[in-house]
């Protein structure tokens, strides 16, 4: 991996995220890059330079999303910023540039785009790993406070959302089993 390119991407991210503290700051970025590096070590065929560069740059669109009050998607804004940034970097092939841009565009859990390539998936997983444990809990409180938002959804909101509301999902299977059990119990009560 090119230490020069990795250091340059880190420096650019530091500039973009300077004074931005909603839990998607440079500390988060460094943890994601470390997670990505560990994943690359364990996954044959991964392109460490491409993955680590994408990891350093993945949240550079966050300040725009924050200041627009969520009207802009940080992953999409970030992908465009990354595209412009990479035009100044000669160490990357055109294919690597596209891979990095696409990974940044596809890293958001709530985004419309899903990971497609190995680079996309490694970045996606490295980012999500940082939402686990005590650090993830602290980031959730920090983000909710900075955005003046709730930490949870009501059951109705959760079930109406895409993650829990899709047909065939675990929640629907459980709901169906529960409804069948209630019918059986009702029949027992009525007949007994």
Predicted regions and their residues:
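Hydrophobic, well-structured mid-protein blocks that either form specific transmembrane helices
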Residues: 85-124
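A short, mixed-charge helix-start or loop-turn motif at secondary-structure junctions
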Residues: 14-19, 64
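His-Asp-centered metal-binding catalytic motifs of divalent-metal-dependent phosphohydrolases/nucleases
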Residues: 48-70, 74, 78, 82, ...
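Divalent metal-dependent phosphate-bond-processing catalytic cores, especially two-metal-ion Mg2+/Mn2+ enzymes
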Residues: 18-26, 30, 34-44, 57, ...
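Amphipathic, well-packed alpha-helical segments that form the structural scaffold of globular domains
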Residues: 14, 34-37, 83, 105
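Short alpha-helical hairpin
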Residues: 1-14, 55
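An amphipathic alpha-helix signature
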Residues: 6, 10, 33, 79-83, ...
């Amino acid at each position: 991996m090119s230490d020069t390119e990795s250091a340059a991407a880190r420096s650019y991210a530091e500039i973009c995220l300077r004074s931005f503290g909603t839990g998607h700051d440079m500390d988060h970025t460094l943890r994601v890059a470390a997670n990505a590096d560990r994943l690359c070590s364990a996954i044959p065929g991964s392109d460490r330079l491409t993955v680590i560069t994408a990891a350093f740059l993945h949240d550079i669109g966050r300040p725009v999303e924050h200041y627009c009050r969520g009207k802009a998607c940080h992953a999409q804004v970030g992908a465009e910023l990354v595209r412009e940034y990479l035009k100044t970097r000669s160490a990357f092939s055109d294919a690597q540039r596209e891979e990095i841009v696409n990974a940044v565009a596809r890293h958001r859990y709530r985004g419309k785009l899903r990971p497609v390539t190995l680079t996309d998936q490694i970045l996606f997983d490295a980012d999500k790993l940082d939402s686990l444990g005590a650090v993830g809990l602290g980031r959730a409180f920090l983000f909710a406070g900075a955005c003046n938002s709730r930490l949870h959804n009501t059951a109705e909101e959760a079930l109406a959302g895409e993650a829990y509301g899709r047909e065939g999902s675990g929640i629907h299977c459980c709901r169906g089993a529960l409804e069948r059990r209630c019918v059986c119990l009702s029949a027992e009560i009525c007949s007994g």
